[in-house]
Design a protein with these regions (language model features):
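Hydrophobic transmembrane alpha-helices and their immediate junctions
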Residues: 45-48, 164, 194-210, 315-355, ...
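Aromatic-anchored transmembrane helix interface
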Residues: 17-19, 43-55, 63-88, 99, ...
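Long extracytoplasmic/lumenal interhelical loops at the membrane interface
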Residues: 121-124, 136, 259-325
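Alpha-helical transmembrane segments of multi-pass inner-membrane proteins
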Residues: 97-122, 138-199
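Hydrophobic, aromatic-rich transmembrane alpha-helices
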Residues: 20-36, 150-159, 286-289, 298, ...
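Hydrophobic core segments of transmembrane alpha-helices in multi-pass, intramembrane catalytic enzymes
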Residues: 17-25, 71-84, 143-158, 183-196, ...
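A membrane-periplasm/extracellular boundary helix in multi-pass inner-membrane enzymes
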Residues: 109, 115, 200-269, 290-293
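N-terminal signal-anchor transmembrane segment
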Residues: 1-34, 54-61, 349-353, 369
Length: 405
């Protein structure tokens, strides 16, 4: 139940769990103050600036045009608390491998039961008894489950020592992603595998891995060739998708308040146009035209939350709602996260691909998981650097003593 509604067609407002997370941040802040930790990392610095620009754009749009809400940036602030949770998980010696393995097993088991119609699932509209067409596991939607499985795959590809276990986990995660019907998550799954194979091995090892992976991908396609992903993609590569988007641009008119997407309609109801593209296209046209209508929007956006629950295009949404400044700060934040470890490098690749067609940076579970992992690896890297400096200092001291003697 919402304590404060965000309005604008959002599925959730500010709830009790939001207050609990804010309380956790207060304890983290007290810990930092007690230990005199005043220096912030580049990751924190860029995200704080992103929050500031998001707040500024929302304040301007909400006061001048009644679009967006200044409460919306609170949700992004809340996500970042998970960064500090990850920090303390590593500090406390938590086994992140077991946690992610449990997450994979639990979601896979529920997803398989959903696929065969044994159980339903809780999505943004409450409990749904039949989720067999597009499974959601323990998440709020198939798009969330797909990205969560991408992240789990990233971890085990980068960290798991056993090649056999790596590809078993990759295979299981890919099968479940096929059941979700999420095309972006499937594309990300293939991309992170290719990137991992390219960076982590010699040519001979890459060839050996290809001999394992290619048959695995063919097996997945053979057994799930008529899956939801395949069915939804029948008209994806049709040139009519682009033609209709361009033809419809001039017919869309911007208004003072953003209309509901239902009022705007779709590009086409014909079978020759991809259904997902048809729904997204009309939203994207409106978002672009509104963004270009005022010079201030170019820099700080039309206001976070202006486009309601889903624009179905993360990169477009973050550009139009937070402007060029917000986009650049968010990209700089991601680049810093990418440098933390091989796992985070793969996670950022998966995240960026999913952002093409999904407002995934607004997803509670996805952002909390990515930032939790980022905080975990940030602390790990920090400790490793400290140990390296300590060891180097000890070696220098040892050599100096020998020279004196």
């Amino acid at each position: 139940m919402d304590l404060i509604s965000l309005g604008g067609g959002f599925n959730a407002g500010l709830r009790v769990d939001d207050l609990i997370i804010c309380l956790l941040f207060f304890f983290f802040f007290l810990y930092a103050a007690q230990n005199k930790k005043t220096k912030v990392s580049k990751i924190e610095f860029y995200f704080i600036l992103f929050l500031f620009v998001t707040f500024l754009g929302s304040l301007f749009s909400s006061t001048q045009y009644g679009r967006g809400t200044v409460l919306f940036p609170i949700r992004f602030f809340e996500y970042f608390v998970f960064f500090y949770m990850g920090f303390f998980l590593y500090k406390g010696g938590a086994n992140i491998r077991k946690l992610l393995l449990l997450l994979l097993i639990a979601n896979s088991a529920v997803a398989i039961l959903q696929h065969f119609g044994v159980v339903g699932g809780f999505n943004v509209r409450g409990y749904q008894p039949n989720m067999s067409e597009r499974v959601i596991g323990l998440t709020s939607g198939p798009w969330e489950l797909g990205v969560i499985l991408n992240f789990i795959t990233c971890y085990f590809l980068a960290e798991e020592k056993s090649e056999f276990k790596k590809y078993i986990i990759f295979g299981v995660a890919t099968l479940i992603i096929m059941m979700t019907g999420s095309r972006m998550s499937l594309l990300a799954q293939i991309a992170i595998l290719v990137w991992y194979m390219k960076l982590s091995a010699s040519l001979v090892t890459i060839i050996k891995r290809c001999l394992v992976v290619i048959p695995l991908l063919f097996a997945v396609y053979f057994f799930f060739g008529d899956s939801t992903v395949a069915t939804r993609s029948d008209s994806l590569m049709n040139s009519d998708n682009i033609d209709l988007l361009l033809d419809s641009y001039s017919s869309v008119r911007i208004t003072e308040s953003v209309p509901s997407w239902g009022d705007l309609g779709v590009l086409s109801r014909g079978d020759e146009v991809d259904a997902s593209w048809s729904m997204r296209g009309i939203k994207w046209i409106y978002a672009v035209k509104l963004y270009l209508s005022h010079p201030m929007y170019w820099m700080i956006g039309v206001g976070a939350g202006s486009f309601g629950n889903a624009l179905d295009g993360g990169w477009l949404r973050i550009t139009t709602e937070t402007g060029i400044i917000g986009l650049l700060l968010f990209v700089m934040f991601l680049m810093r996260v990418k440098r933390l470890s091989p796992t985070m490098s793969l996670c950022v690749i998966a995240f960026c691909i999913n952002m093409l067609m999904i407002d995934i940076y607004m997803s509670y579970k996805v952002m909390s998981m990515m930032l939790l992992l980022a905080g975990y690896y940030h602390k790990k890297r920090k400790d490793e650097k400290a140990r390296l400096r300590e060891n180097n200092g000890s070696e220098i001291l040892f050599h100096n003593k020998r020279e004196v003697l």
